[in-house]
Amino acid sequence: MRDKIVAFQFMFLLVCIGSPSLYAQTDSLPAISTSASVDLMSRYIWRGQEYGQASSIQPAMSATWKDFTIGAWGAYKLTGAGVQETDLYLSKTIGHLTFAIWDYWNFCDTTSTDFFNYNQKTTAHLLEAQVLISGGENLPFNLLGSYLFYGADPSKSIYLELQYQYSAGSTELQFFSGFQAKGEYYGQNSTFVNLGCTMIKTIDVTDRWCLPVSLSFTVNPSQKSTYLVAGITL
């Protein structure tokens, strides 16, 4: 297991630092497209749970070739020491289906850490198998399925989330309902853990630059908690 995971990470690094000539369009090899973004969030909320108890900067980068995407995502507190996060993923899209493997890694920046520790009993990594079913343009529903199959969750939790998307001019709305079907990672039993709505509005700053601003209201019935989070994407 460790060798396979290290090989995956090595492949990710090759994509990220490869020669720029790899990104050129040729007759025999489709172009590799890349993307990068930085989100500034008032809080880091993921699937109904709060992480860090502070504002968060969340960088992301990815490279896509044909229907394969490999990328990295992180969440780091803007104030104070504590738990930080660096994630890697590999996904494949087939029609309305997207399959992905995620490697979530949480670490404390005040203690020694070992990114390459994948021992089942001591690792801070969490490996997830994920599938997303998209309804497409004619059916604005998505269904997300997640299975935490290795690492820091010994209960091997299963999480399901139904999403509904709606657009009105420059404003996008997404309603979501997340349910823990198995395990104890998100709550103590099978229950709804992530209910709410996200609104994203694009604000024109100049003729050539716009700024996406998001507001999310989240309710976690299992923890009896609510969050109202603001964010911008750079």
Model regions and ranges:
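Short loop/turn motifs that connect adjacent beta-strands in outer-membrane beta-barrel proteins
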Residues: 25-33, 96, 136-140, 167-173, ...
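Transmembrane beta-strand segments that form the barrel wall of outer-membrane beta-barrel proteins
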Residues: 38-44, 67-78, 99-107, 114, ...
